[in-house]
Structures are given as C-alpha cells and as structure tokens.
C-alpha cells in the first residue's frame, strides 16, 4: 500500500475499522448524492440515507466482517481488495472501486 491521497487514506482507515459500521463510514468525505452499486445483490442506491439503510442494513444482516487485502489509487479512482466473511463463515473476495470527484469526495462506488 503506497503513499495515498487524503481521501484514499480515509477510505483505508474506514476499511480497517469497518466493524464501526456507518458511523465509521460517515467520516469519509462523500458527495451528498453519491451512488453505490452492488450488482450481485441488485442494489443501486443514492445518498447518505439509502446507503445507510440498504447497504449497511444488509451488511449488518449478514454479519459481514471486512478484511482489507490491498488498496490501490490510480488517478481519480481508489480500488480496495477485500475478503468479506459472513456470519456463516463464507468468505467472498470483493473488489470495491471508489470514484473520487474534483473536490476529493467519494462520488460513486461499485462493489464487485
């Protein structure tokens, strides 16, 4: 994990402390109408409230534990490689791509 920009460091800090849920995520700078897509679950949400209710509700329901494997920054994108373990012990390899806007905030996220 090389030297990262402030927004990439904020994302990294959240991923290393993801057990703090939405409270930890809310410390990351985000555009007010940011979007998150999780194609495997058919989730397409927009804004703080929908992300909190849909995404973090789902993560809580499945008992998700996130392990940050690597984080890479390339231009206006930050990519996180994760192992996500659910309450039944199943481990998923997840790639999250964060698009950063020109104000240094998360503008869009894809969880693949």
Regions inferred by a protein language model and the residue ranges of each:
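Residues at or immediately preceding the N-termini of alpha-helices
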Residues: 22-23, 48, 103
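A short gly/proline-enriched turn/hairpin at secondary-structure junctions
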Residues: 33-45
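A beta-strand edge to alpha-helix "cap/lid" segment located at domain peripheries
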Residues: 2, 37, 52-112
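Residues at secondary-structure transition points
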Residues: 1-4, 42-46
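Short, flexible segments with low predicted structural confidence
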Residues: 22-27, 43, 70-71, 77
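Short acidic-aromatic low-complexity motifs
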Residues: 1-33
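Generic, well-ordered alpha-helical segments
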Residues: 43-50, 90
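Short histidine/acidic/glycine/proline-rich micro-motifs that form metal-
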Residues: 16, 40-43, 85
């Amino acid at each position: 994990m090389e030297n990262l920009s402030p927004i990439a460091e904020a994302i990294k800090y959240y991923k290393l402390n993801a057990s703090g849920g939405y409270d930890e995520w809310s410390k990351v700078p985000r555009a007010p109408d940011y979007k998150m897509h999780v194609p495997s679950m058919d989730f397409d949400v927009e804004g703080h409230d929908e992300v909190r209710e849909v995404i973090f509700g789902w993560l809580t329901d499945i008992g998700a534990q996130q392990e940050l494997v690597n984080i890479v920054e390339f231009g206006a994108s930050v990519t996180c490689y994760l192992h996500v373990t659910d309450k039944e012990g199943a481990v998923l390899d997840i790639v999250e791509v964060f698009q950063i806007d020109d104000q240094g905030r998360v503008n869009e996220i894809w969880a693949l």
